[in-house]
Amino acid sequence: MSGLLCYCRQGFEPELAAELSARAAFVGIAGYARTQRNDGYVLFVCDEAAQLAAKLQWRELIFARQKLVVIAELKGIDPKDRITPILAALEGQQRFGDLWVEHPDSDAGKPLAGLARSFGNALRPALRKAGLLTDKPQPRQPRLHICFLDGDHALLAVADSADSAPWPLGIPRLKLLPEAPSRSALKLDEALLTLLTPEEREALVKPGMRAADLGAAPGGWTWVLTRQHVHVTSVDNGPLRAHVLETGLVEHLRADGFHWKPAQPLDWMVCDMVEQPRRVAERMATWVREGWCRNTIFNLKLPMKKRWDETRLCLELFEQQAEKSLIVRAKQLYHDREEITVLAMRG
């Protein structure tokens, strides 16, 4: 078979399927999405998978944690010998720079974690013997993914390491430090890691920069910024954790973050307020249009129904009302729930 394999948050398969269908149609490639709710992945079946993968950059996909090009689908695999059919399916393929054996991040997929781990250890030497895997990981070469959907059912796929998530299952394993004021700190940590390239992070998040955190309490996002030695104005009528204020980098203003505006332009504005997504998109656009910040990261809380439609509408609304040349990226992060995280930076 030919197509794209994309992982997603369990329950968001319809949104990812709609996104892939819309984006494929936009670039003129015919295909269809194959999925079931709670699978944790979507297969977009098409004849021009490599061409579609090249046109749909991983960082531009909103609901996809990972993007892979499918090589083969194997069903009815003998549990006593899974290696032979995989080697046969890979005959004629180029040498891969690494191997990841995975499973969907879903209720049905998680019990396959043990199989994935042990089978990877068995498959690596067989691939090397067949000349299909380098002796050591080579990140510049394509990466082979084996995704077990069941003990006898697997998808074989390939990733371009420069255009795919650099973490197994597309999930960055971030640790919540004891001093973090809230779990929401992981959202901003992941956003900086996922939405910005290493070069962009180095250039755009520097010590001494100034930022605003709208709706800051109890201070999770503010705390993440102070760890980068950024000066933060935290705007919220609620209290911040004492140790966040003790950094000496934080000014706490007891005000409504939705209506406050800075006296001078800032490098960053971040916002994780619980509010209607269109209202948030419009307010964030005002910040950019008025020049109150150069760059922003904000969350949009999605409705229970028509989430892809609402996502597309909110992003279009934001870009139209911002009236600036912007680079906009959005992602449903692993640490997001019924929401997406949006990055907008000056182009």
UniProtKB/Swiss-Prot annotation:
One of its GO terms (biological process) is methylation. Gene3D superfamilies: 3.30.2300.20, 3.30.70.2810, Vaccinia Virus protein VP39 (3.40.50.150). The keyword Nucleotidyltransferase does not apply. It comes from the Bacteria. Keywords: Cytoplasm, Methyltransferase, rRNA processing, S-adenosyl-L-methionine, Transferase. Its main location: cytoplasm. The keyword Cytoplasm applies. InterPro entries: RlmM_FDX, RlmM_THUMP-like, RNA_MeTrfase_FtsJ_dom, rRNA_MeTrfase_M, SAM-dependent_MTases_sf. Belongs to the class I-like SAM-binding methyltransferase superfamily. RNA methyltransferase RlmE family. RlmM subfamily. HAMAP family: 23SrRNA_methyltr_M (MF_01551). Monomer. NCBIfam families: PRK11760.1. This is Ribosomal RNA large subunit methyltransferase M. It comes from Xanthomonas oryzae pv. oryzae (strain KACC10331 / KXO85). The lineage of its organism: Bacteria, Pseudomonadati, Pseudomonadota, Gammaproteobacteria, Lysobacterales.
